Structure formats: structure tokens, C-alpha cells
Amino acid sequence: MRPTAKEFWDRRAAVYDADAGVFYREAYEKTTACMRKYLKPTDTVLDFACGTGIVTLSLSPDVKALRGIDISDEMIRRAQGKAAAQGIANVLLTQTDLFDASLAPASFDAVLACNVLLYVERRAEVLARISEILRPRGMFLSATDCLGVGMTRERMRKWFEYRTGKRPFVAFDTRETLAQDILR
């Protein structure tokens, strides 16, 4: 039986940082360096699907306040542990989803979505919600794997896990199909 997204990410939390260090360390470094250019010290930012806080905690010194949310209790628990160990005070990490009523309309200067849009089945609803919670002239910053381009070992593994029911929804977008969804 296919796991729910929450079940899948709760299980992955234990190995996520180790895997990210092997497969994605350079990508995370490039992503945070690029995002940092767009953020201001006065910004209030939401990191949607923050996972273990890799991006959230890295960008926290660059903004006024950063809220990280994730559906996985285990991911949030690990992110909270890292934030406490690093003495980071301007970050609030909570287990919830993007449709939580506490995420008020027009309440964020920026919304970050790192490596999550490929796992969002109801993408139009999610993008509409992001637009709703952004302040006027707010920014949506995303870095998303486009699995529909090329076939690496990692992409083949994700495809196989999805097709065999071991992984929840995963999209195999190209840059063009992802951009079309975002710009609608």
C-alpha cells in the first residue's frame, strides 16, 4: 500500500540529512546563496515543507523572522533540535500544512518552496494558497527537481519507488511544465 506523504517523510527524517549531504549538499548551498540575494533583513518568510531545516536555518540570519512548516512531525522535531543547538531565535518550526488557518492572507514577504513542488499532487491549489499568503509584491522562491529531464540513478529510483507504491505522488516535470504551473 502506498504510504501517505506524512508517513513517507516521517520515515525519511532519520536519514534525510545524511542523504542530503551525499546527494544534494552542493544544490542546497547554491539554492541558499541564490535565495539570500532576494531576501531582506526586514522580511518575514515562510519555508513551506522545510524538512529538517537545512534551508530554513541557513537563511535565518538574513531575515527578521522565518517560519518553517512541514507535514512530518519527525522532520520538524529534527529541525527544532538543530535550531535549539545553534541558538537560533528568529525561527518558528511547526508541524502543519500550507492550509493552516494561522497562515493569514498577506502575511509573508517571501515563501520558499525547496524541493517540494514535485511532490505536490494538488499543485494548483497549493500555488493559489502561496499567492494568498504572500504580501503584495511578495516573492515566491522555489528550487525544484525536474525529474522529467534526463534519467539519473536518483530519478530512476524515485520513479521506481512511485510506480511500485513505495513513495507517495511524485511529478516528472520538465522546467517548462513546472514554469507553466507556477505562472498560471
Residue ranges with predicted function:
Residues M1-K40, L141-K166:
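Conserved class I S-adenosyl-L-methionine
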Residues K40, V120-E121, L134-R135:
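Helix-to-beta-strand junctions that scaffold the AdoMet/dcAdoMet cofactor pocket
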Residues L46-F48, T52-D100:
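Class I SAM-dependent methyltransferase SAM/SAH-binding core
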Residues L112:
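A conserved beta-strand element that flanks and buttresses the S-adenosyl-L-methionine
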Residues N115-V116:
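Short catalytic micro-motifs in class I SAM-dependent methyltransferases
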Residues A124-P136:
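A short glycine-rich, Lys/Arg-flanked "PGG" loop and its adjoining helix->strand segment in the class I
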Residues V170-R184:
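Short alpha-helix
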